[in-house]
Design a protein with these regions (language model features):
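Flexible, glycine-rich phosphate/dinucleotide-binding loops
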Residues: 8-9, 75, 119, 145
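A generic structural signal for alpha->beta connector loops
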Residues: 37-40, 107, 133, 182
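Proline-centered helix-kink/hinge sites
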Residues: 79-81, 115, 144, 163
Length: 184
């Protein structure tokens, strides 16, 4: 499947996406890449046009079938896929709720800078945040200043991070501008 996500955004967001990319990469043409027509290459727009209006019923075993394949460096530092079943993900969500009994369903504001393709970002942050109805403040390219600004602007109550980032935040010149007591 070959696609360009900006083509599917509503008007203003489509324009801003193209404008922002242009500032980063210079004068580039954004659109469908020139991919040779082959039997195994499909344009996303064509697949959408062919999609049925209702989807067929699918049977699966939640304890066996894979729901997601996030990546982690684990203890070795080498990236590896973690095969999560539907059951694993629900168990993680239930464990997340039990681990943080002080969180109020639908009331927390989470700074979500961790990548969702990584197991920590996908399961702990995204899955638990969304299933509990929390607000996730997303970053496409997180930076220390942006994280600190967002923590105050959105009145963050939850911040999941990694030790390296905690060090950067601790030593940052603007860290005293954040109400850290609000975090749970």
């Amino acid at each position: 499947i070959v696609t360009n996500v900006s083509e599917y955004l509503p008007g203003l967001k489509k324009f801003l996406g193209k404008t922002f990319l242009g500032k980063i990469f210079g004068d580039i043409k954004i659109g469908t890449p020139n991919i040779p027509k082959r039997a195994n290459v499909h344009q996303f727009q064509d697949l959408l046009a062919q999609a049925p209006s209702s989807l067929p019923a699918v049977s699966f075993d939640p304890k066996v079938d894979i729901a997601a394949l996030p990546y982690t460096g684990g203890t070795t530092g080498n990236p590896k896929g973690v095969m999560l079943t539907h059951y694993n993900m629900i168990s993680a969500q239930v464990s997340g709720q039990a681990a943080f009994p002080g969180f109020e369903e639908g009331k927390e504001v989470i700074i979500a800078f961790l990548p969702f393709f990584h197991i920590y970002g996908q399961v702990v942050l995204m899955l638990n945040g969304l299933t509990q109805g929390h607000t996730l403040v997303l970053f496409t390219t997180p930076d220390t200043e942006g994280i600190l600004e967002a923590m105050e602007k959105y009145k963050a109550t939850v911040f999941y991070g990694v030790p390296t980032l905690y060090e950067y935040l601790k030593d940052h010149k603007d860290t005293n501008k954040v109400s850290w007591k609000r975090l749970k």
